[in-house]
Amino acid sequence: MREPLTRAFPAVLAAFLAVMAAGCSNTAYLAQGEKLYTGAHLTLEKKPGTPDDDVLEDQLEQLMLPEPNGTFLGLFHLKLWLYNIGLFGKSLGEPPVLLSSVAPARVARRMYSLLQNKGYFQTEVSYTIQAEEKTAEILYTAELLPPYRIGSVTVKGESSPLADSLRATMRETLLHPGDPYDLDTLAQERSRIDAALKERGFFHFAPEFLLFEADSSAGDRNVDIALTVKKGIPPQATRIYTFGGLTVLSGYSLRRDSLAVPGGDTVDVDGASYVDFDKKFEPAFIMRSIFLKRGQPYSRTNHDLTLNRLMNLGVFKFVNIRYDDADSAGLPLLDAHIYLTPVLLKTIRFELQGVSKSNNLAGPVLTSTFRNRNLLRGAELFTLSLDGGFETPFGGGQSGLNSYQAGIEAELTLPHFVTPFTLENVFSRFVPKTHMDLGFHLLNRLQYFQMLSVDASFGYTWKETTSKEHIFNPIAFTLVHLAKTTPQFEALLNANPFLRRSYEEQFILGPNYTFVYNDQLETDRKNHLYFKGGIDLSGNLLHLAQSLLTRRRASPEDPYKIFGAPYSQYARIDIDLRHYTISGDQSTTLATRLIAGVGFAFGNSSIMPYVKQFTVGGSNSVRAFDPRSLGPGSYRTPDSLAANSFVDQAGDIKLEANMEYRFPLVSILRGALFVDAGNIWLVRDDPARPGAKFRGSTFLDQIAVGTGFGIRFDLSFFVLRLDLAFPLRVPSLPEGERW
């Protein structure tokens, strides 16, 4: 049934779109004299010497408001049609945008103002309305002469601490002779100078105290700019302030005036008065995250560093810094008060999930998590998780327990680096972390096997910038042990050598490193990039040490062992690259994703450990195929294996790509059209799985392709996703039948 449906889907979709396009005539619903506004077009008439500027053109086009009614797939006004037919009381659609709601003269004035701000001082903007019987569009025309450019940049004023500091900041100026005159750049320069002066202690200075004088009389389309300080600014704005006093109030609450409530112990720590109301934190630990020091000039950077570090500790609900003038004997001094309000430090959480699989197995999973954010009074995060669940068959006349699982995991995260040597506080903006993890897991499939696993790791996490994060685990340990097997399972392993190797005891020991780049917090961008890349190594140092000590050569048939068990030796690299293109009005998004990975076993091992292999298929992969059911290559799983729920297809190489177009429908409902492609392969031949090895001449023909559509319920705090996908190419089918 899958193949006819796959071939019919494109035709059905095309027919649906054709019917919708033919039936969506919206002008018939307009009243007498009304015209549907269909949009605007902009023409730039450039005189010789005027540069091309796509950014400026985009900015002008964004002023052409309002937007006309949106279209579905660029073909028809779906939401306008839904509004016109009155479906669900017109709540699913959008009302028509009429020509009478457009103010083209106002739009033209805004365009003129923007061009003036960009240095096009001699320009004209006009518009015409092109009207049909029921529709109308507006044509805007801007005549541009070459823009004015910056001639010279000077700083006016006699020598003084403020004027001298102002001149010193000009080494980093944004204004350069020859650059186009731009009012936005002048505003950025004023903000930059204000920030630079605050770094030098000018606490009371403000950007509005700066004045740019522009003179275009020099000719040759140049503007000379002179920077000066306005007259009559407050005297405090011209003085450099230093810290006279520093008070830290730990356990502060808005329900009381902490300065007046007795009972808070006050101690002197590094020259600061530390007032402790709740005695939950070690004062010396808190002071390591405070960069404001008595006797030092005020610095905006140190202010921000203090706020960031204290909040990133994860133990404070609110952090506030208040500055008071404390002039003494004519000296410009500041008193700083740091208020720390802690969060609830100990929590416990229970989570119940229902699991349903495509092999007719279902059951509950219960997870309980205890979290202590301040284990040793230094913001040490301790997490203890317990989980358990079972699966039982439903339907098909089956009954009884099929499997159960249980696990315990403990993690300790410290807000600093733990190293055998001293590290300077180079990662001062973000809190560096050391984490230690230990976990035990039991999986019992009653008819087949009982498996035990142990995981442990020690490593570091630190952020280089807001968008860059590093995760390095010098020690990562995994032991997977098949404790018990049934005769039925042994017979299955004997018939499938690869399956047997996949379930052999796996001892993994080695380092891993992950780099993450994510600029999605930068909301002013139209395009966002996410990248995650990792490298995972196992057994290499052990293998080197044992080969030097034993002077014998190991092989997969005669491997080196540790604690009486052979260990895995491999190298694994994987990347996850995502790109998001967002429309100017934030309504639509084109999301693309590329995933690639390769793992290679050598030395002590002939195959990658099963837990380190790659899989494809499922709701977060190629959605038209069941989870972990694709590949490797063109290999088709025999029915005897497919009937067993524990057999997943895995490989050493993975390629996967996705493209998804997301668009609004109504209210919180959004739609999505997507295409997925991908597969996995083996590095080496496996006689039991023909067609599974990666070959450069055939791998493109073995990539599975699926497509579909979905809806998203965007509730801001979470998104509910429903997708319907269809396979377009099935690589396990014979050649000529895959599409």
Regions found by a protein language model. Give the residues of each.
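Gram-negative/organellar outer-membrane beta-barrel architecture
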Residues: L162, K279-K280, S299-K532, R623-A624, ...
